[in-house]
Regions:
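Short, well-ordered beta-strand elements
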Residues: 26-37, 59-64, 86-87, 135, ...
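Extracytoplasmic "Venus flytrap"/periplasmic binding protein-like
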Residues: 47, 51-121, 127-129, 154-157, ...
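Hinge/lid segment of periplasmic solute-binding proteins
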Residues: 92-145, 154, 170-172, 196-202, ...
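C-terminal lobe and pocket-closing loops
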Residues: 97, 269-279, 292-403
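Short, solvent-exposed loop/beta-turn-alpha elements that line the ligand-binding surface or hinge
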Residues: 108-120, 162, 190, 207-228, ...
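Extracytoplasmic/periplasmic solute-binding protein
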Residues: 130-139, 144, 167-218, 230, ...
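Conserved C-terminal helix/tail region of periplasmic/extracytoplasmic solute-binding proteins
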Residues: 154, 365, 376-440
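Glycine-centered hinge/linker elements that transmit conformational signals in sensory
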Residues: 172-175, 214-245, 287
Length: 440
């Protein structure tokens, strides 16, 4: 009898050990890169990861922050080494770099699945479509509005209502400029950096100007671009001194300080107005446009792309798909948008935009009118080089990386060139990098 009991116990122990080993072998450990370094953004990512792991105990996920300044270098190095993260949060320019190095898996199946379930905004998936495949899954997006301080408009213009067209835009900027009291009408940059490209392109959307035509030919040098640059130049005189060197941080600090009354910018200072100033004196509307122009703005969809080596790691591709499905659930996606950075990131699906969790966020609800304006503006927003629902020029990553649009602006506002000469220069520079896809 004792021998029988001993034998049974031995068998049970062996079975338990085998089961435990088998369980451990089934745990998939995913690693991904993203570029959102502020502590509250990292915390939002971790909250999502913790919730995911609670529902998927056999999948462990690790986030790694790679600063934007290092993103291209580290991505290229990982591709050359043939090993890196399972997936990466990115923007179209960086995705295109990985695509051109033949490092990506198409994600058409998961994009179509999510589109059917949650309904992607068309302009959010357009930057990722090429040769009948999607190469990135949009997760969240960013959009420019005309941000402003209502109290300053009331004081200097006599109304808290923002300008409705470019004529009023210039009138407001002039009236709002009071150097003796350290108040200026506008906050736009003049340096050679990405923010200036973002601001300048927003004006281009209002005139209908583009980098390329539908076949990918460079068409930058045209009257619509010149009209946009003229408006930028005319507004620039109402900047604070030193705006030539500004980037994102200076816009945010100066609109908080009440030094600038208006700025075409992401409505992303909500968290600071709420938590640091406890102020409602911050608003935003769709960017004004000229007579004969149209509504428009820049949007930056942020996506996930997946590397080929992920499919070679047992279980990793399936686990990555599970993670993507999880974060696209509207009851989870609000953590990636409203919680990560209210006003900085917005949902890319109709379902997530309508989710009660998003609108119940205390900061989103405090600045609800501004956030509804952002959601509405996405319908008319686009990204330079990606306006046609597919890739038309594979040189767009190099063109934006070279800050050609920003340098056009710099040459204009610094007085180094006439608008016509600067636009012609920019057109010729774009031609050097241009790789038209053609009408495929």
């Amino acid at each position: 009898m004792k021998k029988s009991i001993f034998f049974i116990m031995t068998v049970l122990i062996v079975v338990t050990l085998v089961f435990s080993i088998s369980y451990c072998e089934k745990v998939v450990e995913l690693t991904f890169w993203h570029h959102e370094a502020p502590a509250h953004r990292v915390a939002a990512f971790q909250e999502v990861i913790d919730l995911f792991e609670a529902e998927h105990p056999n999948i462990k996920v690790t986030q790694e922050v790679v600063m934007w300044g290092d993103a291209w270098i580290k991505t290229i190095a990982a591709i050359e080494a043939g090993s890196g993260p399972d997936f990466q949060f990115s923007i179209p320019d960086l995705l295109l770099t990985s695509y051109l190095l033949d490092a990506l898996l198409p994600v058409t199946d998961i994009v179509e699945e999510l589109d059917k379930e949650y309904d992607f905004i068309d302009s959010m998936i357009a930057p990722y479509f090429h040769e009948e495949e999607y190469w990135g899954v949009p997760i969240m997006t960013m959009v420019f509005l005309l941000t402003y301080r209502p109290s300053l408009l009331e004081k200097y213009v006599g109304t808290s209502e923002p300008p409705k067209n470019w004529e009023e835009y210039l009138e407001y900027a002039k009236k709002l400029t009071d150097p003796k009291n350290n108040v200026y009408g506008i906050g736009i940059g003049g340096g050679i950096n990405l923010m200036i490209s973002e601001q300048a392109y927003t004006f281009m959307t209002n005139t209908g100007a583009k980098f390329f035509d539908e076949e990918g030919n460079v068409i930058f040098n045209n009257p619509k671009t010149i009209q946009a640059m003229e408006m930028y130049r005319d507004l620039f005189q109402y900047n604070p001194p030193g705006a030539e060197a500004w980037s994102w941080g200076e816009i945010e600090l100066n609109i908080m300080a009440g030094k600038i009354a208006m700025a075409p910018y992401f409505p992303s200072v909500q968290r600071r107005f709420d938590m640091e100033l406890d102020s409602d004196d911050y608003a935003a509307v769709a960017h004004p446009f000229p007579a004969g122009g149209k509504p428009g703005s820049i949007t930056y969809p942020n996506e996930i792309h997946i590397y080929k080596w992920t499919a070679e790691r047992p279980g990793h591709l399936e686990a990555t798909y599970d993670f993507i499905r999880f974060i696209m659930r509207p009851d989870i996606n609000y953590l990636m948008t409203a919680v990560q950075e209210p006003g900085g990131f917005y949902p890319v699906t109709v379902a997530a935009q309508e989710a009660p969790e998003f609108w119940a966020d205390p900061i989103i609800s405090r600045y609800e009118e501004m956030n509804r304006a952002a959601i509405e503006a996405l319908a008319d927003a686009s990204l330079y080089g990606f306006e046609y629902g597919r890739w038309v020029n594979l040189g767009i990553g190099d063109i934006t990386g070279a800050n050609i649009l920003a340098e056009v602006v710099n040459r204009i506002v610094a007085g180094g060139m006439t608008i016509e000469d600067a636009v012609e220069w920019g057109h010729n520079e774009m031609e050097k990098y241009s790789v038209p896809v053609g009408n495929k």
